[in-house]
């Protein structure tokens, strides 16, 4: 496999785009590679400018549950496009989509549509602080909630502490109200409650940005109880897991009803769309009814809403969709683990519905510290081998993979066979 055109394209992009990419992970820096420049996608496959094709386990980082260029979704987008791209005014489609979202999630009365997961979490936190009338926020090490300043925070000295900025350009003042606790650790979390005047807690119930690390059920139930005890708003960030892990996101697995929730990715079917929502008494604090300001020129734009609505209609019609996707994810993760065992390579694998992850690690991964113990050098070697064998995996050991509806058992088995070849070559030093 050659990537000559992609190499040239990447060099050219670096001249006019900061870093050559519009989101850092796309640069393939952590796997020491060159990103293939994509020409098109269809179904489960990606096609690059060098005429290579790949089984795509990234699926645009999660939104494409029906794969690339789904004919029904594509047709509906084109029909909507003919009527206009954006109006800056209400449409019936927005209400229809909101009804579909609300109907799938317990405790969700109202939503507000936005353009990105970052906007959704940022707005949800502002709303939660207004409702609780308390400023401090608890987040968890390893969870990602977008790139707003108050959330680009890492733990300081100790696992339960007021955080420090994790990015240049973020003033300390932005992080002084953010406490960072250890994921899956209730003791660490309650320490944070005792240290600050906590108004809200935000968490990925199925974390997808330290690799795939699901919350333990007793932890999430305990977190809900702590929020009730300390009168804090619980925000579940389901931007990635919502409509992905199941029709009801994490609720299928945990049964936890949050005060607020954020969705994204699947609800936009590959176009920029996200939302936040929750109980009516909280949501009604939003302008124009209440005093919490939030707005967006392109929020609820008809193309994204049409795409998302088309995807949700397809999901709801297909009663066995999640069962099939889960079975394929299990087939893949079990196949990868068995292959690694044949070469005495430590590999931990897991899936939650159509989300899957794997760590080159001898032990189960329950939090960010565990994830950091994984062999990232081995991951980089494995990723490069798989890429050149036509299998497109997330280009970081701290990302999550995704199954899409067009995938078949034959595709999964082929990917496992390529993994076996890759492990063999790595062990032999080829």
From Swiss-Prot:
GO terms for molecular function: glutamate-1-semialdehyde 2,1-aminomutase activity; pyridoxal phosphate binding; transaminase activity. Its EC number is 5.4.3.8. PROSITE patterns: AA_TRANSFER_CLASS_3. GO terms for cellular component: cytoplasm. Its main location: cytoplasm. Keywords: Cytoplasm, Isomerase, Porphyrin biosynthesis, Pyridoxal phosphate. Gene3D superfamilies: Aspartate Aminotransferase, domain 1, Type I PLP-dependent aspartate aminotransferase-like (Major domain). CDD domains: OAT_like (cd00610). Pfam families: Aminotran_3. It catalyses: (S)-4-amino-5-oxopentanoate = 5-aminolevulinate. It is found in: Cytoplasm. The modification N6-(pyridoxal phosphate)lysine is found at residue 265. GO terms for biological process: protoporphyrinogen IX biosynthetic process. Pathway: Porphyrin-containing compound metabolism; protoporphyrin-IX biosynthesis; 5-aminolevulinate from L-glutamyl-tRNA(Glu): step 2/2. Its cofactor is pyridoxal 5'-phosphate. Homodimer. Belongs to the class-III pyridoxal-phosphate-dependent aminotransferase family. HemL subfamily. This is Glutamate-1-semialdehyde 2,1-aminomutase. The lineage of its organism: Bacteria, Pseudomonadati, Campylobacterota, Epsilonproteobacteria, Campylobacterales. The gene is hemL.
